[in-house]
């Protein structure tokens, strides 16, 4: 006689019956429940994530070589970031293997540099090289809990989305926080009144940057007591913060003047050296308005140089994803051979410098130069060659 219990579908792995699980998926000759599926997924994702960022697979020189393919100049910053990232991913691999011996703490990164010099590009290139989830946010959109705006957990939600809600993968990802200098506190002394978008945000960021178990609302928005949340361990998430820090050069120069002269000698009309930012110390960042505890969470500092005309010309034409190569490809799809004279590229670079937009503004300038040609030429099958000269660049920019 057949036992009735034998007729009830059950998981072939854990043995739970259909009425005791949420879902039971049927195969040709077996069943698997939702719990066992989740368990298998976590095991596989952990192995894949560790493989993707295993420190044995790359060296600092490998990282720098990859930077060189996409980023022009900035040699010092490339080396600093290459070493910092290499050590970071050695940390969590080493901590897993030697959990009872020495625990290595992570070193988050601060990138200082003017607008359009490549701060965001560094972070994006790193994430692409490491093949890990990446999220980018603007520090000015974050406010303290209880106030209008995003709270710090929303940063982690974006990282979780980038990882397709794979928690294990997200916990090995990279977060880039832009405009970090905009959340400096309003005065040197600790604030007595509430500063919801300055010192308060720095305080809120401290825990997740150091390492904590954060409760993240999967749908975004402010948390409320009855809301479902996802737990994320931020211990191995690499945080990279970037900002222009306008005025920091004067703070450094004044400190050096005090140390040299023995008394306070405020700089009046004396021009500050463009390389002085590379001499930044934690105390200068505190003077700027970053709280000491926050500065302490960013022990690695990379300073980017302001891009010169030659740098911008190189950015236009040399990297793998250079704009000139992109437009040559686009015109080539219409069987048009596009080229630029050297003077044309120099004129584009000078325009970016004049507008103070750096490399970030190059695409907008190139679009304004090529827009009419991209509109007219696809309809004109007789044109096979287009050479952009200095005169064309000047004329097209004058018309926009």
From Swiss-Prot:
Location of the ClpX-type ZB domain: 1-52
SMART domains on file: AAA, ClpB_D2-small, zf-C4_ClpX
Binding site for Zn(2+): 11, 14, 33, 36
MF-aspect GO terms: ATP binding; ATP hydrolysis activity; ATP-dependent protein folding chaperone; protein dimerization activity; unfolded protein binding; zinc ion binding
Coiled coil: none
GO biological process: cell division; proteolysis involved in protein catabolic process
Keywords carried by this UniProt record: ATP-binding, Chaperone, Metal-binding, Nucleotide-binding, Zinc
Binding-site list for ATP: 114-121
Alphabetized InterPro entries for the sequence: AAA+_ATPase, ATP-dep_Clp_protease_ClpX, ATPase_AAA_core, Clp_ATPase_C, Clp_protease_ATP-bd_su_ClpX, ClpX_bact, P-loop_NTPase, Znf_CppX_C4
One cellular-component annotation, GO: HslUV protease complex
NCBIfam families: clpX (TIGR00382), PRK05342.1 (NF003745)
Subunit structure: Component of the ClpX-ClpP complex. Forms a hexameric ring that, in the presence of ATP, binds to fourteen ClpP subunits assembled into a disk-like structure with a central cavity, resembling the structure of eukaryotic proteasomes.
Function: ATP-dependent specificity component of the Clp protease. It directs the protease to specific substrates. Can perform chaperone functions in the absence of ClpP.
Family, as annotated: Belongs to the ClpX chaperone family.
Protein name: ATP-dependent Clp protease ATP-binding subunit ClpX
Source organism: Neorickettsia sennetsu (strain ATCC VR-367 / Miyayama)
């Amino acid at each position: 006689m057949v036992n009735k219990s034998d007729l009830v579908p059950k998981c072939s792995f854990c043995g739970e019956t259909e009425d005791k699980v949420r879902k039971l998926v049927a195969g040709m000759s077996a069943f698997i429940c939702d719990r066992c599926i989740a368990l298998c997924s976590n095991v596989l994702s952990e192995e894949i994530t560790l493989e993707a960022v295993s420190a044995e697979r790359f060296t600092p020189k490998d990282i720098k070589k990859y930077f060189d393919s996409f980023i022009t100049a900035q040699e010092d910053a490339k080396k600093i970031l290459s070493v910092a990232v290499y050590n970071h991913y050695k940390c969590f691999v080493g901590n897993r293997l030697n959990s009872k011996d020495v625990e290595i703490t992570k070193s988050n990164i601060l990138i200082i540099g003017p607008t359009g010099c490549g701060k965001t590009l560094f972070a994006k290139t790193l994430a692409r090289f490491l093949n890990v989830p990446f999220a980018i946010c603007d520090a000015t959109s974050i406010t303290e809990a209880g106030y209008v705006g995003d709270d710090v957990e929303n940063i982690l939600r974006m990282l979780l989305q980038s990882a397709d809600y794979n928690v294990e993968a997200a916990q090995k990802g990279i977060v880039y926080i832009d405009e970090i200098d905009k959340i400096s506190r309003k005065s040197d002394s600790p604030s007595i009144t509430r500063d919801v978008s300055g010192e308060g945000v720095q305080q809120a960021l401290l825990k997740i940057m150091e390492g904590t178990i954060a409760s993240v609302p999967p749908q975004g928005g402010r948390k409320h007591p009855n809301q479902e949340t996802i737990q994320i361990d931020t211990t191995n998430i690499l945080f990279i913060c970037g900002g222009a820090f306008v005025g920091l050069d004067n703070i450094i120069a004044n400190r050096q003047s005090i140390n040299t002269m023995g008394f306070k000698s405020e700089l009046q009309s004396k021009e500050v050296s463009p390389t002085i930012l590379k001499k930044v110390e934690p105390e200068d960042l505190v003077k700027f308005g970053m709280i000491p505890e926050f500065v302490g969470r960013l022990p690695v500092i990379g300073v980017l140089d302001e891009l010169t005309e030659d740098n911008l010309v190189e950015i236009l034409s040399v990297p793998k994803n250079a704009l000139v190569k992109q437009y040559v490809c686009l015109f080539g799809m219409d069987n048009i051979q596009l080229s630029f004279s050297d003077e044309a590229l120099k004129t584009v670079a000078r325009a970016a410098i004049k507008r103070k937009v750096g490399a970030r503004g190059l695409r907008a300038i190139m679009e304004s130069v090529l827009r009419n040609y991209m509109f007219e030429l696809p309809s004109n099958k007789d044109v096979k060659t287009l050479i952009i000269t200095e005169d064309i660049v000047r004329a097209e920019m004058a018309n926009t």
